[in-house]
A protein has these predicted regions:
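Substrate-binding surface in catalytic domains of secreted glycosidases
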Residues: 1-110
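Acidic/aromatic/glycine-rich contiguous surface patches that form carbohydrate-binding/processing clefts
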Residues: 85-87, 146-184
Length: 184
């Protein structure tokens, strides 16, 4: 069952469908990515308040849409990414956020740690409203989740009474740092 961020057709029978399923996984990742015009957060917990040049969507807005559509809280699972996106060729404005880019690719959490986070060329920042970290340096913007943001999302799922959380993709977190944060 899809969530249409652009407000187009969305299945209107979620409450009927929900009686036949054990759970529905809300894949609250890839909310933004290389298909967009601007570098943005892959999976913001909440919608940033500043002006974004593209559509506004977040984990919270997606969960609320599913609940409004009739999926019971106890059947809804919140998906958390164990990967991020590297946007190259961004301008040094707003630390790369909402800037156009020349190329982009997905990269797993382990690769973000070894290839970017521990390099002095990149500065780690955290967006207070979106609740997620990002890196900026060398005209590169990197959107990802870390242990703190994964923990916040898991706490959000519990506070909302959701069935639980799920991850994509476990092999991107071989040290289980994110998995432990999700469980804790």
């Amino acid at each position: 069952m899809g969530y249409n961020r652009n407000g187009g057709y969305v299945c209107q029978r979620h409450s009927k469908v929900s009686q036949y399923i054990d759970y529905a996984l809300d894949m609250t990742y890839d909310l933004h990515g290389p298909w967009d015009t601007y570098a943005d957060f892959n999976s913001p917990l909440y919608t940033p308040t500043e002006s974004s040049p593209q559509y506004k969507i977040s984990v919270d807005s997606s969960i609320r849409a599913w609940l409004s559509a009739g999926i019971p809280k106890g059947k809804l699972v919140l998906g958390i990414p164990f990967y991020g996106y590297v946007y190259n060729g961004v301008k040094n404005t707003n630390n790369g956020l909402y800037q156009t880019f020349t190329s982009a690719k997905a990269v797993g959490y382990d690769s973000i740690i070894s290839n970017y986070l521990n390099k002095s060329a990149y500065t780690k920042l955290t967006h207070s409203t979106a609740g997620v970290p990002y890196l900026f340096g060398n005209n590169t913007f990197i959107s990802y989740d870390d242990a703190a943001s994964v923990k916040k999302k898991a706490q959000y799922a519990r506070s909302q009474g959701l069935r639980g959380t799920a991850a994509w993709e476990l092999s991107y977190d071989r040290s289980a740092v994110l998995l432990k944060a999700m469980a804790g």
